[in-house]
């Protein structure tokens, strides 16, 4: 009887060991972007996975349907209905004696704009995807010649190396020790250029192309492309979702403004890609925007927040930056069917994070 119990115990232990070895992780960094009549879905690779299954649920449908089985880490679905919302989820699988499935990654949503390339919400959804998992790297997103986008600046989805590098850093992280460590993270203009590339394109691009440029030139250049309007720092009256704000030393994206005049923004600034808040219109620190940024960083990025809890920025973010604002509507590059440009930062953050 003792021998039988011992054998059963060993079988159970061995069985658990085999299952542990066979267990697959869930895909991280899942991102979906509607680009005209196409949807590109990307994710970070899962260790030991042989492939991935992608499921879709279109607006008005009750259940998810499998739409693709692939060995790659990104796919493009073509000829999608315009002006429609789509949800996606991805899981990894491994084929041994039988097929083993991992858990689904985070469910994501995008929209194919009816008459535009993309939407303001798609832009902000893309911009917050690397938050909390991507460090600030001086030169990150640029080419070695420092003349334009490098591989990361024209990369569809998240580079898994960003998360790997981020996970090894401590609260004492000093970006000066990692200058031009290409592939490890993004600097301010590399981040903005990467965000725009991902709402405009569906395939990785060639270094030297894309939308990475000096921070000081971004707002004026995007206006010259015909995407929207430009205002110098002295002419700015308000801040709206999706605004790109340029100065001689930095560039950031507006998430939304608050009733006290403070602004929630997303940017790559030491230590990395994160949400931050400005003072209110009277210059008082610790206003609504900072409270919102802290609350969302603490809730959704706890590991990052424990290491880098600072979320406040100075008054210069409201006074010293030129502004680019997307023109929306029929025939524009970005449309705003979600009316983000008319919503407060609180409403936008709730929609981006809480309504999943």
Language-model regions: role of each:
Residues 10-24:
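Sec-dependent signal peptide cleavage junction
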Residues 20-48, 82, 97-115:
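Pro/Thr/Ser/Gly-rich low-complexity, intrinsically disordered linker/stalk tracts
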Residues 53-83, 95-99:
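Recognizes extended acidic, P/S/T-rich segments that occur
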Residues 202-280:
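...with weaker cross-activation on analogous glycine-rich loops/strands in unrelated enzymes
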């Amino acid at each position: 009887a003792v021998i039988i119990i011992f054998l059963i115990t060993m079988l159970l232990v061995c069985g658990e060991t085999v299952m542990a070895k066979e267990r697959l992780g869930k895909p991280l960094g899942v991102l979906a972007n509607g680009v005209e009549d196409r949807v590109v879905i990307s994710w970070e690779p899962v260790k030991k996975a042989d492939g991935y299954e992608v499921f879709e649920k279109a607006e008005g449908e009750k259940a998810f349907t499998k739409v693709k089985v692939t060995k790659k880490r990104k796919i493009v679905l073509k000829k999608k209905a315009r002006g429609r919302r789509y949800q996606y989820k991805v899981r990894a699988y491994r084929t041994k004696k039988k097929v083993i499935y991992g858990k689904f990654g985070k469910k994501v949503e995008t929209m194919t704009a009816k008459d535009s390339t993309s939407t303001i919400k798609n832009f902000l959804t893309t911009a917050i995807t690397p938050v909390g998992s991507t460090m600030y790297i001086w030169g990150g997103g640029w080419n070695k010649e420092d003349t334009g986008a490098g591989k990361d600046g024209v990369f569809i989805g998240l580079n898994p190396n960003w998360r790997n590098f981020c996970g090894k850093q401590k609260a004492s992280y000093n970006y000066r020790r990692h200058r031009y460590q290409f592939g490890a993270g993004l600097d301010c203009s590399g981040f903005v250029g990467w965000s725009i590339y991902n709402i405009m394109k569906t395939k990785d691009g060639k270094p030297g192309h894309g939308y990475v440029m000096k921070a000081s030139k971004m707002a004026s250049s995007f206006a010259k492309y015909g995407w929207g309007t430009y205002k110098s720092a002295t002419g700015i009256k308000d801040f709206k979702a999706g605004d790109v704000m340029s100065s001689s030393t930095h560039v950031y994206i507006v998430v939304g403004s608050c009733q006290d005049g403070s602004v929630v923004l997303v940017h790559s600034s030491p230590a990395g890609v994160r949400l931050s808040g400005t003072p209110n219109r009277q210059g008082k620190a610790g206003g609504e925007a900072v409270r919102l940024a802290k609350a969302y960083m603490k809730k959704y990025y706890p590991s990052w927040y424990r290491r880098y809890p600072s979320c406040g920025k100075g008054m210069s973010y409201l006074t010293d930056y030129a502004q680019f604002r997307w023109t929306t509507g029929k025939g524009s590059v970005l449309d705003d069917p979600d009316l983000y440009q008319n919503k407060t930062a609180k409403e936008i953050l709730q929609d981006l994070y809480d309504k999943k």
